[in-house]
Amino acid sequence: MKVLYPVCTIFVLKIDMPMDILFLVGGLLLILLGANGLTDGAASVAKRFHIPSIVIGLTIVAFGTSAPELTVSISSALKGSADIAIGNVVGSNTFNTLMIVGCTALFAPIAITRNTLKREIPLCILSSIALLICANDVFLDGSGENILSITDGLLLLCFFAIFLSYTFAIAKRDGSMKEPEKEHLQEEDEIRLLPAWKSALYILGGLAGLIIGGNFFVDGASGIARGLGVSESIIGLTLVAGGTSLPELATSIVAALKKNPEIAIGNVIGSNLFNIFFVLGCSASITPLRLTGITNF
């Protein structure tokens, strides 16, 4: 029996692993399709009600590109896989900053504007500091373990609301709300105005894709972690984070190929802020998230 046990274990892993990979890939595809459908439907509704393109970009489009991270982290939190929920955000932000900016710079030099240096980058650093403070209960108040509590989640969501208010105020002050720039007008022209029934279908179908795909993706990631004998934190920081960052990577590379590499910086900063303030904020508000030594210090 002792000789047969390892053989049986390997046999089971060989059977389960392809299914887990199928769940992972299939779930990610459903998430991407769902995010695309939801974004198209919501953007069409926004255009129908004459909502400015800058508002659409800051809300609907930003949600669309970060929907994989949001879906996976919330699904993980609901399933009790806190390591995947947190590792997904931390790993995704690391992937965004190093991989996406690096790949974009390989295609074209990236010019950092003065506003980006003065506004967006400090906000991005602030979000990381806020997460560092919320996630280090043991170091700060001597608690027995590090937990992102419901209070921490609500605090992060408050920061997200402040960030949105600040962004809208800056856009209004600069005249972007009343007199959109040429590039914003072009973006607005590219938004398809769908019939009301089709917009509703896109939105509902997109939500269904996000929910079902999120469950499949988390189940696949957890199964792969068990099959490889590694922690869910490692899978969350690497495989899951890389998969959920694919929309940002594709957007940034396409922007670089179209000679607009500066879009990559805004894309990365916006995604990183959204991930920490909104994704982790929502996840921790639903259920407390316990941090391990891998996802924390």
Language model features with spans:
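Hydrophobic alpha-helical segments, chiefly the membrane-spanning helices
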Residues: L4-F297
